[in-house]
From Swiss-Prot:
GO biological process: positive regulation of hypoxia-inducible factor-1alpha signaling pathway; positive regulation of protein sumoylation
Protein name in UniProt: RWD domain-containing protein 3
Species of provenance: Danio rerio
Function, in words: Enhancer of SUMO conjugation. Increases SUMO conjugation to proteins by promoting the: binding of E1 and E2 enzymes, thioester linkage between SUMO and ube2i/ubc9 and transfer of SUMO to specific target proteins which include hif1a, pias, nfkbia, nr3c1 and top1. Has no effect on ubiquitination.
Subcellular location: Nucleus; Cytoplasm
GO cellular component assignments: cytoplasm; nucleus
Taxonomic lineage from the root: Eukaryota, Metazoa, Chordata, Craniata, Vertebrata
Statement: the UniProt record of this protein carries the keyword Lipoprotein: no
InterPro entries named among the record's database cross-references: RWD_dom, RWDD3, UBQ-conjugating_enzyme/RWD
Length: 257
């Protein structure tokens, strides 16, 4: 960790000093630092946000990766907040920026939420339907950019959250209603999503459903769908740990390696 990053973490831990406000989740010379900030945003009422920052060893020359979740916001709103923070981070000079991003979010939160709400009628998915978790394994992606674009489009339309992990293993982790997950799997099998070895468009014929189960009540619901380019199996395991699904990893993923 650079001295700049270390100094910034010290400042952040001093600012967010109440219990549960600041937590370092992971730290290594190779991967950098992953930490969580829990904050309350004043917007007529207090909105709790959990923001996870991943600062790489190249930080601040490389902006942090960011995840946002909140029980008071919809998946679309969390997605839009994350996108706005990432865009802002890209526009800033190469210097410590996390505290500045937190201040920017506080100042612009109301406008960002209004804009997001205009794009989507939902404010918070109020549903009594049971939330399910599904884990899919893909053999390959030849037309990766187009494939990912379709995956993101369908998860947004079907109000599914989760992760797409690309790398040695290609996994799609989904959370949502059972009906919407079934519809997603149907789309994946019936629409031409990739190309074959000759470059001709083709349907997904080598996808396997590793599991499709009700989400345990004690597990946190993911509020966004994010694409993660995972270079190592250790990184993949840590990603499952971060979202509280390490049991899922050990039960269904470790046997694939």
């Amino acid at each position: 960790m650079s001295k700049e990053a270390f100094d910034e973490l010290s400042v952040l831990s001093a600012i967010y000093c109440e219990q549960g406000e600041f937590e370092v989740l992971e730290e290594s010379p190779e991967k950098g630092v992953v930490f969580r900030v829990h904050t309350l945003i004043d917007n007529n009422e207090k909105t709790p946000l959990d923001i996870i920052f991943h600062i790489s060893p190249e930080y601040p020359n490389t902006p942090p990766d960011i995840s946002i979740s909140s029980n008071h916001l919809s998946r679309r709103q969390c997605h839009d907040l994350r996108r706005s923070l990432l865009d802002t981070a890209q526009s800033l000079p190469a210097e410590p920026m996390v505290h500045g991003l937190m201040l920017w979010l506080q100042e612009n939160f109301s406008d960002l939420i209004k804009t997001s709400s205009c794009h989507s009628a939902e404010v918070r998915p109020e549903t009594t339907e049971e939330t399910w978790t599904a884990l899919l394994h893909l053999d390959h992606m030849r037309s990766k950019a187009k494939y990912i674009k379709l995956i993101e489009k369908w998860t947004l339309e079907l109000r599914l959250t989760g992760r797409l992990f690309t790398g040695k293993l290609i996994l799609i982790l989904l959370q949502g209603t059972k009906e919407n997950i079934k519809q997603y799997i149907h789309l994946l099998k019936s629409v031409k999503v990739d190309v074959d070895s000759s470059g001709k468009r083709c349907k997904e014929k080598m996808m396997s459903v590793l599991c499709e189960i009700p989400k345990p009540e004690d597990k946190i619901m993911m509020t966004t769908f994010e694409v993660k380019d995972i270079l190592s199996l250790d990184d993949l395991r840590r990603e499952f740990d971060l979202i509280g699904l390490n049991e899922l990893y050990h039960q269904f993923v470790s046997s694939l390696t």
